[in-house]
Amino acid sequence: MSTFTHINCQGEANMVDVSGKQESVREARAEALVTMSPETLNMIISGQHHKGDVFATARIAGIQAAKRTWDLIPLCHPLLLSKVEVSLTPVVERNQVRIESLCRLTGKTGVEMEALTAASVAALTIYDMCKAVQKDIVIEQVRLLEKCGGKSGHFIAK
């Protein structure tokens, strides 16, 4: 069984020391789903939302969030991300927007939290921009899809 890397031998929260690790290319992909009414989704897709381009705003918010993950999650390292991508795809038959984020760097620690934060904040931005027209929007299935690089190896969600 694995141990918690962020807890020291006294049981206290602790930032992991990565100074002895080798640099490698690390990449992570995450997703979030945002479910809403057909009318709200159509308003977003057609560009008729009174607040502007929901997808563009959510994309930028996700990218900004990935870059600030270390500032939001206390034990995350500040990272020099070399790539952040956020894509938003309407899934009309399910009244959803599927958000997928990708983060990449060459470094000593992984980028899973950055990818998860990007997808989460993009989803929250959609909610924020659309809450005036629909309050019961659901954000769900925020999850890591894939990670590679580093000593823990390659992970792909089932």
UniProtKB/Swiss-Prot annotation:
Coiled coil: none annotated. This is Cyclic pyranopterin monophosphate synthase. Keywords: Lyase, Molybdenum cofactor biosynthesis. CDD domains: MoaC_PE. The keyword Lyase applies. Homohexamer; trimer of dimers. Catalyzes the conversion of (8S)-3',8-cyclo-7,8-dihydroguanosine 5'-triphosphate to cyclic pyranopterin monophosphate (cPMP). NCBIfam families: moaC, PRK09364.1. It catalyses: (8S)-3',8-cyclo-7,8-dihydroguanosine 5'-triphosphate = cyclic pyranopterin phosphate + diphosphate. Substrate binds at L75, C76, H77, M113, E114. GO terms for molecular function: cyclic pyranopterin monophosphate synthase activity. The active site is at D128. InterPro entries: MoaC, MoaC_bact/euk, MoaC_sf, MoCo_biosynth_MoaA/MoaC, Mopterin_CF_biosynth-C_dom. Signal peptide: none annotated. It holds the Pfam family MoaC. Belongs to the MoaC family. GO terms for biological process: Mo-molybdopterin cofactor biosynthetic process. The gene is moaC. Pathway: Cofactor biosynthesis; molybdopterin biosynthesis. SUPFAM superfamilies: Molybdenum cofactor biosynthesis protein C, MoaC.
